[in-house]
Amino acid sequence: MIPGNRMLMVVLLCQVLLGGASHASLIPETGKKKVAEIQGHAGGRRSGQSHELLRDFEATLLQMFGLRRHPQPSKSAVIPDYMRDLYRLQSGEEEEEEQMPSGGLEYPERPASRANTVRSFHHEEHLENIPGTSENSAFRFLFNLSSIPENEAISSAELRLFREQVDQGPDWERGFHRINIYEVMKPPAEAVPGHLITRLLDTRLVHHNVTRWETFDVSPAVLRWTREKQPNHGLAVEVTHFHHTRTHQGQHVRLSRSLLQGSGDWAQFRPLLVTFGHDGRGHALTRRRRAKRSLKHHPQRARKKNKNCRRHALYVDFSDVGWNDWIVAPPGYQAFYCHGDCPFPLADHFNSTNHAIVQTLVNSVNSSIPKACCVPTELSAISMLYLDEYDKVVLKNYQEMVVEGCGCR
């Protein structure tokens, strides 16, 4: 059984065991009577067996999602706006005007083209000011990447820093500053506090009259830590100002939380490390256009009384299986399923194989040979934004989750 069909089967079985009217969205009308019969025959044995089966089913689902256990997010878990916007761009939701990503975010075509998983990491709040020259301000950030699975190959990584427009002043028109990003090769020596051995990863000269996020390539450092298993001593960020006094330094590049800033506000403006990786399963992230998918399915909706093989609606609601506490988006999705007769002779629109045509022909003269079956012939992926077991936000592409076409096979 292909992974997509396994996924649908397990979800349906979970709903049968859970029972109740609240789960009707996952059970087609034609199957409700059968569900009632199963529940009736189960009797007193249902409770214990159901819980045991549910555990097995959930374990199977979590394994398919690449998780070792059911995530239980803490109340302090934060979903970065960047990850929400990236999900909307990747899934095609940016076509809806009211959900346009903020800040003019552009979809990262190049890093996403080699990845099926995007992960975000906030620094460990272990912020160290690094003493430097009078015109510089430098900070060290430590990111814990231990939650990245061993089978996930990182292809690229970026550090995102938020900077605010500097108030106008005498040097406003010619005001520039340079942001340097370093990998810390060795931690501060005890004999020389604050002194770091670093290597430059990326640098940018920016004008201070714009409020925006800046993205820096830190792939060499993250690849050393994950692929080569080298020690992770963090990143150093240095901001060099050319036309400001020491009192104005670092105030517009958000590297640390101010005393007057609330925790909620700071959470959305903290430095963010984003990794792009691939676990070897399925295809890379690709932007999808929702409008095209909707138009594609309109012809099948008109044939409501047709009993022949076709696609039927099947909405999977993650709240029905108690997963809405860790799955951020989507709240559910239209999985669809295939059902119907494969009559003789098979017409071209049944999308049949030569073998199915021969099998149907033989069935017409010998009923002991079964008819061809109505099955999915085309499947597509969905993207999920969720919190993993370590409260890290993950955007992942899951293959073969949506039935796009049915046929007799």
Swiss-Prot record:
Propeptide: 20-293
Key words, A-Z: Chondrogenesis, Cleavage on pair of basic residues, Cytokine, Developmental protein, Differentiation, Disulfide bond, Extracellular matrix, Glycoprotein, Growth factor, Osteogenesis, Phosphoprotein, Secreted, Signal
Matching SMART domains: TGFB
Compartments, record wording: Secreted, Extracellular space, Extracellular matrix
Signal peptide range: 1-19
Example of a GO cellular component annotation carried by this entry: extracellular space
One GO BP: positive regulation of branching involved in lung morphogenesis
Residue numbers carrying Phosphoserine: S91
Taxonomy, superkingdom: Eukaryota
InterPro entries: BMP4_TGF_beta-like, Cystine-knot_cytokine, TGF-b_C, TGF-b_propeptide, TGF-beta-rel, TGFb_CS
Alphabetized Gene3D superfamilies for the sequence: 2.60.120.970, Cystine-knot cytokines
Main localization of the protein described in the UniProt heading: secreted
PROSITE patterns linked to this entry: TGF_BETA_1, TGF_BETA_2
Region (Disordered): 91-110
Family indicated by similarity: Belongs to the TGF-beta family.
Protein name in the entry: Bone morphogenetic protein 4
Species of the source: Oryctolagus cuniculus
